[in-house]
């Protein structure tokens, strides 16, 4: 049995939930973090000493860090549909997962917190605009990759698309300036056709 700790509005938790849905894995989810609190509870800290979500328990095996969890869940699928069989494509999937953490995650909280969780009169509009400008430059890097292939690692959807897809939903839903990135647009349209993406990621931002 798979148990996932984390609120369903968290981008990092959504990675794990999306992967589980893609492979049809049953799971139980526990609300924790954000408005639910509980991250400093000793029982939760025993699961993840960092006090962050998501955390999973799969048949007694505990794991934290969203990308590690997403990779792990993808590996549970006997069909292997989320992992490219080609070694280079598998490495590309890994590459773009890591790229999200190193290039998108840094400026994203400034935009999310500024627009969703800060009253208009208290917002630092210059900081939000600067962070979004940085993000748009990063999205252009992914757009260039998607000019060569329909998904980040090749012709088929893979685990490598999941982290970027979670961030992309926020890019397209937030009231921000977006540059013209046609290949990113086409990729995002393909993601929106996936039932698991619709169920897990396409939810109100808050």
Segments and roles (model prediction):
Residues 1-9, 14-129, 143:
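GST-like domain detector, emphasizing the conserved glutathione-binding G-site
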Residues 14-17, 190, 194:
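Short, cationic motifs built from Arg/Lys/His that form the positively charged side of catalytic pockets
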Residues 26, 50-53, 79, 103, ...:
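A general structural signal for well-ordered secondary-structure junctions
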Residues 34-35, 160, 205:
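Conserved beta-strand edge residues that scaffold enzyme active sites
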Residues 92, 100-193, 200:
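GST-like fold's C-terminal all-alpha helical module
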Residues 117, 205-206:
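Carbohydrate-binding/catalytic loop surfaces
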């Amino acid at each position: 049995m798979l148990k996932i700790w984390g609120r369903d509005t968290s981008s990092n938790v959504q990675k794990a939930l999306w992967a589980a849905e893609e492979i049809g894995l049953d799971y139980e989810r526990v609300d924790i973090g954000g408005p639910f609190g509980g991250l400093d509870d000793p029982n939760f800290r025993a699961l993840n000493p960092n006090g962050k979500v998501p955390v999973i328990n799969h048949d007694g095996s505990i794991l934290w860090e969203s990308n590690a969890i997403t990779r792990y869940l993808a590996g549970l699928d006997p069909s292997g549909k989320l992992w490219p069989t080609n070694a280079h494509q598998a490495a590309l999937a890994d590459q773009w997962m890591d790229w999200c953490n190193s290039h998108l995650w840094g400026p994203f909280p400034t935009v999310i917190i500024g627009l969703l969780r800060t009253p208009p009169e208290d917002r630092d509009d210059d900081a939000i605009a600067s962070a979004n400008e940085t993000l748009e430059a990063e999205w252009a890097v992914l757009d260039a990759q998607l000019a060569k292939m329909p998904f980040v690692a090749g012709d088929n959807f893979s685990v490598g698309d999941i982290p970027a897809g979670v961030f992309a939903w926020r890019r397209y839903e937030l009231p921000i300036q977006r540059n013209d990135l046609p290949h990113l647009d086409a990729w995002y349209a393909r993601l929106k056709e996936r039932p698991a993406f619709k169920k897990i990621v396409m939810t109100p931002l808050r």
